[in-house]
């Protein structure tokens, strides 16, 4: 709900007293004119303080702004939803004034959200409120606050979008001007949020290739904390554009007040947290302006990406649940449609794609209950067949030597085996060893007067997506596949290179600093065009693993590849961190081979299955190398996953015991909104003799309901002591269940890994 909050004057003591004075005939020493002047003056004073407050509300939160026309936009409050009484008095709490969107130039010695250079060289801004407008969309309410410079015809609209079916508020700006010549935007953050000083901790993600989504938690200390990306294409390998602030001490999963923030952008970003010796941490989020100064033409509108904010008094997991619900409903393609169980060919055959081998893999995944087969890299190239990563990108024609029956033959095989078919592409990239590059060397990103810097395979280059011809070429890759083979159900969209050359043959020499921004504008145009024509297509975002895990692209993509590292133990850590901001339905989590192809660690199949079942289950393996016993275990697991799939992919997450706490155990669970079903995961993460592991208490259940417990993926000779037994939600949340440290299996099957998946269902 969005309110221009108007006060009921008679409810305030000062007005009640004045009204009583006016009514009293005994106060003959005060003239009516004098009494009315006092009343009118008080009205003006109070109106200027309060009547222009704007309250932006979701079901459980409030964001309050002071927005007097002709005055400065101020931040007043963000947190738990306020009552009517609290709204009346929110300006009287003694809280220091803070700007809601600080600009550079006048009385601004600190960090700013917006800094420009006017056409006449003036570097200052002084913004005042012109008007406040509100509007409604389905399940959302929007307030737009228009700001204008006091001297120059320079405008900023600050937007607040409050979702009424999720506790998330999106903030963004639109910048425009009517000056005679271009204005240079040197800094253009999407949003600013002051956070009251206290024992505030920051949770954020970091990593690298094959080690994405690692969790870091730290107290905010004086100084500047900067989290930024300059990759150009992939923005979530080394850091993430999402953070959480725990407001009352060291972060807790299921207790404490938490603000979550996610910048919805696919390109270079910068998050700044400025802490000085005053009352606030100052948080800025937006596009990374480094090497990206933007020349804004008259009447052109520059829109910044949305910053999504959420607040929860139920700890980190509560903030995650808010993000997940918002994502499934609004920020993820087909976010409420359960995902298929698939087999991807990559770790099974790598580039060694062939017709018979693909048919066999389809047959194998079908026999285990899978629903989709995805042919990965290696299927294309004519003059330069794709035998490794050094050639062929850009030449999106079938290699007839590998696939003599073509894609149509594969589709027939898929139909025969009763599975859907998907295919891999990397459309934003090319190899210099390709027919494409021979025809269009000017379509790649390249610095003038410099040799082209090449990436993967020694020959890979990035296409210039600022160029409309390149945009059309990329769209046509997908359009040709889908037009010629409409039975294709799934596309894996990869991107395996950073921008290593700063230069665009399409942009003018004066606008070379626009390159990063225009690349992602072009990328979004392509995605919009594809989704407009193929709204039902499932698309995975892969970028050397988890390089494109962000809410800038997910409205167009159904899921993402968490990491090229499929090692089950390391995946626990990566998927744990990723779950802070992204729901399980979007996290592709695959059962792979042992020894693992990245870490060479040998992990038992049961453990690999139990980890993969905590996300969107799939397989990344060569089935013909599996034993019949292993295939049977996978077949049973797939059948059981189909039962729990709606709970895992659409349920509420409760993280219970973090692997980062190094207690020897990681544990989490998903619970339906109705609290009638739940899936509980327990993984042993450290292995020592005579360990003493903590007992894990459950969360999110109804204390008054009774739950029957059943173990999934059981390999033990004997059932667990509590198998089939019933417990109250109150008991399970207060005490948990004692999980055995090891599996009771035959001696030759003993190993140092242990994991359990429990299915809880309400007994009615």
State what each model feature region is.
Residues 105-127, 253-267, 311-332, 370-377, ...:
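Glycine-rich, aromatic-flanked loop segments that form ligand/cofactor-binding clefts
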Residues 334-476, 485, 490:
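Aromatic-lined carbohydrate-binding/catalytic grooves of carbohydrate-active enzymes
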Residues 404-406, 438-440, 444-606, 616, ...:
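Active-site neighborhood of glycoside hydrolase catalytic domains
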Residues 60, 243-245, 253, 659-703:
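Carbohydrate-binding surface patches
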Residues 53-65, 72-274, 290, 706-722, ...:
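Polysaccharide-binding surfaces and accessory modules of carbohydrate-active proteins
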Residues 60, 173, 299, 414, ...:
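Conserved, mostly hydrophobic/aromatic
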Residues 686-764:
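C-terminal beta-sandwich/jelly-roll accessory domains of carbohydrate-active enzymes
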Residues 124-128, 294-313, 753-761:
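Short Pro-Gly-centered flexible turn/kink motifs
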